[in-house]
Amino acid sequence: MQYKKTLVASALAATTLAAYAPSEPWSTLTPTATYSGGVTDYASTFGIAVQPISTTSSASSAATTASSKAKRAASQIGDGQVQAATTTASVSTKSTAAAVSQIGDGQVQATTKTTAAAVSQIGDGQIQATTKTTSAKTTAAAVSQIGDGQIQATTTTLAPKSTAAAVSQIGDGQVQATTKTTAAAVSQIGDGQVQATTKTTAAAVSQIGDGQVQATTKTTAAAVSQIGDGQVQATTKTTAAAVSQITDGQVQATTKTTQAASQVSDGQVQATTATSASAAATSTDPVDAVSCKTSGTLEMNLKGGILTDGKGRIGSIVANRQFQFDGPPPQAGAIYAAGWSITPDGNLAIGDNDVFYQCLSGTFYNLYDEHIGSQCTPVHLEAIDLIDC
C-alpha cells in the first residue's frame, strides 16, 4: 500500500513539473516577424510609460498620434502582470516620462493622481497601489510592479511624448526635463571671431577687456577659436586643456586636437568628420525620455530580444495574451518569451508589433498584445531611461 502511494505521489509530482515547463525551449518562443530597425539589445536599464493611441488612427500613424496624446505610466504587481490605474492627473509638458513601478508579485500597476502612491495588499496576497492618492511633487503617475509579475498602466495623463531627457529641479521644487542637445549654438563675439561650446561642464568661453578670447580649464568640450588668418579652429576631446596666447594676442586652446575646423576660400566654416560622427552616435539612441527611479519602479533589461525585470523574471505574452513577467522559465502556455525590441520611435515591440492594449480590470488596466474585448484601447509602451533623482 505504501509502495502504491509513493508511485502515485511521484506521478503527480512529475505531472506538475511537466505542466509548468513550456512546450519548447522558452527562448525560442518568439514571433516569426521582427520590427524593422528595432533594437534587440539595450545597454542600460529602462522603464515604460503608456502612450494612448487614437482609436481612429491606423497602426501606421500611431506613433505620430501618440506624441500628442496622454502619457500613462504602467505598474507591475507581484505576480508579474502589467496593469494601470484610472484617472491620473495631468502632466506638465516639461515633465519627464512616467515611470513604471513593480511590486512583489511581478504585476505592474500605476495609481491615480500620483507618482508615488501608497501600496496596499489585497486578500490574495498581491500588492497593489491605491487610487486617488495625493503625494507631493508628482508630475506623472508611476508604474509599479507587484509580486506576481503582472504589469499595469495608468489612464488619462495629459502630457505629450517628450523629446527632452535630462532632468533638473527649479526653485519651487518642480522637476523639469531639458532637451538632449548634441552641440551648443555657435555665437560670434565683437571682434568677429566664431565660438561654440559643446557639452561643457566647466566655465564658458569669455572675452576680456582687450577683445581677446579666453577659455577656462577642465572643459569637457573644446571652445572654438579664430587665429590671425581668419581660420576657425576647434579642439576635440580636451578634458582640461590649458589656454595659451600666441604672438598676435589671440588665445588658442592647446593639446589633444584631432581635427581642426577649417575655413575655405569662400569664408564658410567646415566642421570635421569626427564632430558629425559624434552627433550621429547620439542620434542612434531610440529612447528620448527619462524618468526618476523610485522604490518599486519597474526596471527592465533587453538583451538578445529577451526582456527581463529587476528580479530576473522573463517578460512574456502568456496564454490569455497578457503581458507579464514570470520564472524563469516563463509561465506554462506562454505564447512569446523572446523577440522583444525597442523601435526607432522608442516604443517597446514584440515581433513586428508595437501596439498593445490596455483592458479595464476593476480599477486597473491589464496590458495585452491583442484586443480582447470592448474595455480595451490601443496604446504604445514608450521606453524611458531611469535615473536617480
UniProtKB/Swiss-Prot annotation:
One of its GO terms (biological process) is fungal-type cell wall organization. GO terms for cellular component: extracellular region; fungal-type cell wall. Residues 19-72 form a propeptide. PIR1/2/3 repeats lie at residues 71-89, 97-115, 116-134, 140-158, 164-182, 183-201, 202-220, 221-239, 240-257, 258-276. Covalently linked to beta-1,3-glucan of the inner cell wall layer via an alkali-sensitive ester linkage between the gamma-carboxyl group of glutamic acids, arising from specific glutamines within the PIR1/2/3 repeats, and hydroxyl groups of glucoses of beta-1,3-glucan chains. The record marks 81, 107, 126, 150, 174, 193, 212, 231, 250, 268 as: Covalent attachment to cell wall glycan. Residues 1-18 form the signal peptide. Transmembrane segments: none annotated. Pfam families: PIR, PIR1-like_C. The record marks 72-73 as: Cleavage. The keyword Cell wall biogenesis/degradation applies. Component of the outer cell wall layer. Required for stability of the cell wall and for optimal growth. Required for resistance against several antifungal and cell wall-perturbing agents and for tolerance to heat shock. The PIR1/2/3 repeats are required for the covalent linkage to the cell wall. Their number varies among different strains of S.cerevisiae. This is Cell wall mannoprotein HSP150. It comes from Saccharomyces cerevisiae (strain YJM789) (Baker's yeast). The lineage of its organism: Eukaryota, Fungi, Dikarya, Ascomycota, Saccharomycotina.
